[in-house]
């Protein structure tokens, strides 16, 4: 696996374009990963996902969704890795220790383990337990075990979080060094620090001294982390990380484009297609929330988004999807997820194109308007 990065200086604001290559697959950055639970993308089966264009070739699977089912014993017996087990043979897998889709109960983490919450309750996971599980999953990337705390955690608890996470990282590295089967899986260091600038910087500086492939920025997806705090902490954190290594952030939420700008680049891209995409940017940047349960859509025969080239907008109408939703048809969720995924992937493509063509400020204005 290798990562190529190109830093672009736009009127004093540094941004990065990059390409993360593993085997024949490439993830262009800034970009996104496809989130799934237990190997299932919400509403979409593997065969449907394969029909979509430009889907990132790596699946983000949180530990909590797979540690119980399929679990260590089944995956070890299967012997072909998690990607094959869940039906995504042509895709790769990224395993994260954190999962922001559930409630974070950080107070149950301990000095030698973290608590992972499954359907049957609490499971303690040590760095060695985690590494053994990752070993049978055979992911392309995996995150180091981490003790994530919210922005409002006390100073003492936040410092302990950073200390624990660094110790967990060292133990994951030690296990990886002793087991050749993990050498094909790249380890990403988790950067913690809650809402404290000093601890964020300490975590970043210490993590940067370890032999890791990249970094995950933790804690920005918690409910206690407001937008102003995110904008303050991101640039102060990333400035302490090596420029040549990729960064990944979990659950940044709705201010994604602002976060990309304020963080002085989260990740990076070298786009081969140099076509002007100003029309695409206009379409993607102008949006509103549709509640298709409302009765006013029962005779609306327009597409979800005018000009959208996704399968849903090319073949179906708001009225049809309204009918599916109010009758609780499974196809309604499938079509909405297909459209939203297409739009989100296009959103990042427009960001990359605007950076390459030196039109980042113009794109920002469309979102700020």
Swiss-Prot record:
GO terms for molecular function: metal ion binding; tRNA-guanosine(34) queuine transglycosylase activity. It comes from Trichoplax adhaerens (Trichoplax reptans). GO terms for biological process: tRNA-guanine transglycosylation. Non-catalytic subunit of the queuine tRNA-ribosyltransferase (TGT) that catalyzes the base-exchange of a guanine (G) residue with queuine (Q) at position 34 (anticodon wobble position) in tRNAs with GU(N) anticodons (tRNA-Asp, -Asn, -His and -Tyr), resulting in the hypermodified nucleoside queuosine (7-(((4,5-cis-dihydroxy-2-cyclopenten-1-yl)amino)methyl)-7-deazaguanosine). It is found in: Cytoplasm. Its cofactor is Zn(2+). It holds the Pfam family TGT. Keywords: Cytoplasm, Metal-binding, tRNA processing, Zinc. It comes from the Eukaryota. This is Queuine tRNA-ribosyltransferase accessory subunit 2. Residues 263-282 are annotated as: Disordered. One of its GO terms (cellular component) is cytoplasm. Zn(2+) binds at residues 308, 310, 313, 339.
């Amino acid at each position: 696996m290798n990562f190529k990065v190109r830093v672009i200086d736009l009127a004093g604001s540094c941004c990065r374009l990059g390409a993360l290559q593993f085997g024949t697959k490439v993830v262009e950055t800034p970009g996104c990963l496809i989130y799934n639970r237990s190997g299932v993308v919400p509403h979409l089966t593997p065969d449907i996902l394969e029909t979509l264009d430009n889907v990132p070739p790596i699946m983000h699977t949180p530990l909590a969704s797979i540690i119980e089912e399929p679990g260590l014993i089944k995956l070890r017996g299967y012997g072909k890795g998690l990607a094959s087990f869940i039906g995504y043979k042509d895709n790769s897998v990224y395993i994260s220790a954190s999962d922001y889709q559930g409630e974070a109960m950080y107070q149950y983490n301990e000095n030698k383990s973290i608590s992972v919450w499954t359907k049957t309750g609490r499971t303690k996971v040590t760095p060695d337990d985690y590494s053994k599980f990752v070993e049978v999953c055979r992911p392309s990337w995996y995150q180091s075990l981490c003790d994530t705390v919210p922005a409002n955690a006390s100073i003492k608890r936040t410092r302990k979080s950073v200390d624990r996470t660094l110790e967990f990282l060292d133990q994951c590295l030690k296990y990886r060094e002793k087991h050749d089967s993990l050498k094909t899986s790249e380890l990403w260091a988790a950067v913690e620090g809650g809402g404290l600038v000093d601890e964020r910087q300490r975590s970043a500086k210490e993590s940067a001294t370890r032999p890791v492939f990249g970094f995950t920025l933790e804690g920005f997806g918690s409910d206690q982390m407001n937008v102003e705090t995110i904008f303050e902490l991101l640039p102060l954190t990333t400035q302490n990380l090596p420029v040549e290594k990729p960064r990944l952030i979990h659950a940044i939420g709705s201010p994604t484009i602002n976060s990309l700008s304020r963080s002085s680049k989260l990740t990076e891209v070298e786009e081969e297609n140099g076509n002007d995409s100003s029309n695409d940017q206009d379409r993607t940047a102008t949006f509103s929330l549709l509640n298709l349960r409302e009765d006013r859509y029962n005779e609306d025969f327009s597409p979800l988004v005018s000009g959208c080239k996704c399968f849903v907008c090319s073949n179906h109408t708001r009225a049809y999807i309204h009918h599916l939703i109010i009758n609780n048809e499974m196809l309604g969720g499938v079509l909405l997820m297909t459209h939203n995924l297409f739009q989100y992937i296009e959103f990042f493509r427009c960001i990359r194109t605007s950076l390459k063509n030196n039109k980042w400020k113009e794109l920002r204005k469309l979102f700020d308007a």
